[in-house]
């Protein structure tokens, strides 16, 4: 293909040099507009039609959908444009300067996962786009690291229906067919303050939280006993108590206590059912102490995800890679993209480097990643399969 694009390393360098941090702290949250425009300029050069959509209820966040070819089916290659914030005191390299050392590329987003777009664009150099028989779509989303607002909006609004989708998260090029979901809640209890010398004149919120945690532990045991999927290394839903705070003085009856907890459900356990179980577990406390206990979401919940391993598209990927699809315990945008078409998670780099100081991707992934992307495009967009 005779196109004017920077070399692979320069593509990578420009992606890393374009900050796109997403964070719940608005003082460090950044728009991804510059990165979206950068991708759009490259993809236009190749011949893609570009659609850029603002993501509702966000500050300066955009999705990009690039389309090459027309008709039904085809392939959707997906990635998120944002990164997590970086720990300034722990990085030994500039997070926004691509640094090559010891056969590794260092920088914020090298593995998770802005670099995936460089791999896609580089693979397209060898593709004769005039021979595309089914469409190739490239989706770049916003805010995966916080609310997954970009993927949620795309799934709810798009009209495209590809045959298959790949999300290029860092899986060490192992195909991922399922992962757990994530539900995070704040349990808040309002007591009644008073002097600690006379406990009966107050209601100690810490005591009530202690009872509530007992009910939650019973639910945790129930989840472990009744829900099981041996495909996962941790084959049951997990519950974690991650933060607790209550009281303001040793000689005062605690008037307020707050617990932050999360549950990671298996695929098949719906968020609606899980919320029902959570409310049912705490109902005795609500009945005993009316109006004193509330349950609030900390983040928008993410459902579990599973692409059936007997799906013909999964078989294609497994044969191309020579390995079976696996499961993981972390979350991706797959539950939302799966609403559009069958989806696998597959990309270069290791999840062990995600969200870490001196994030890197090993350069040994360059050749194999370019090869598998080319094979996927050939199978889903060029051949008569």
UniProtKB/Swiss-Prot annotation:
| Family classification | Belongs to the peptidase M20A family. ArgE subfamily.
What is this protein for, i.e. what is its function? Catalyzes the hydrolysis of the amide bond of N(2)-acetylated L-amino acids. Cleaves the acetyl group from N-acetyl-L-ornithine to form L-ornithine, an intermediate in L-arginine biosynthesis pathway, and a branchpoint in the synthesis of polyamines.
Its taxonomic path starts at: Bacteria, Pseudomonadati, Pseudomonadota, Gammaproteobacteria, Enterobacterales
Q: What is its main location?
A: cytoplasm
Q: Kindly tell me the pathway this chain contributes to.
A: Amino-acid biosynthesis; L-arginine biosynthesis; L-ornithine from N(2)-acetyl-L-ornithine (linear): step 1/1
Q: Which reaction does it catalyse?
A: N(2)-acetyl-L-ornithine + H2O = L-ornithine + acetate
Origin species, per record, is: Photorhabdus laumondii subsp. laumondii (strain DSM 15139 / CIP 105565 / TT01) (Photorhabdus luminescens subsp. laumondii)
A single GO BP: L-arginine biosynthetic process
Q: List the disulfide bonds.
A: none
DNA damage as a keyword of this entry, yes or no, is no
Report the active site residues: 82, 144 (proton acceptor)
Which terms does the record give in the GO molecular function aspect?
acetylornithine deacetylase activity; zinc ion binding
**Which CDD domains does the record associate with it?**
M20_ArgE (cd03894)
What EC number(s) are associated with this protein in UniProt?
3.5.1.16
GO terms under cellular component: cytoplasm
Residue positions annotated to bind Zn(2+) 1 are: 80, 112, 169
- Gene name? argE
Annotated compartments: Cytoplasm
Quaternary structure note: Homodimer.
Q: What is this protein called?
A: Acetylornithine deacetylase
Keywords for the protein's UniProt record, in alphabetical order: Amino-acid biosynthesis, Arginine biosynthesis, Cobalt, Cytoplasm, Hydrolase, Metal-binding, Zinc
* Entry-linked InterPro entries: AcOrn-deacetyl, ArgE/DapE_CS, Bact_exopeptidase_dim_dom, Peptidase_M20, Peptidase_M20_dimer, Peptidase_M20A
The family database entries (NCBIfam families) matched by this protein are listed as: AcOrn-deacetyl (TIGR01892), PRK05111.1 (NF003474)
Q: Which cofactor does it need?
A: Zn(2+); Co(2+); glutathione
Q: Where does Zn(2+) 2 bind?
A: 112, 145, 355
The note on cofactor binding and number reads:
Binds 2 Zn(2+) or Co(2+) ions per subunit.
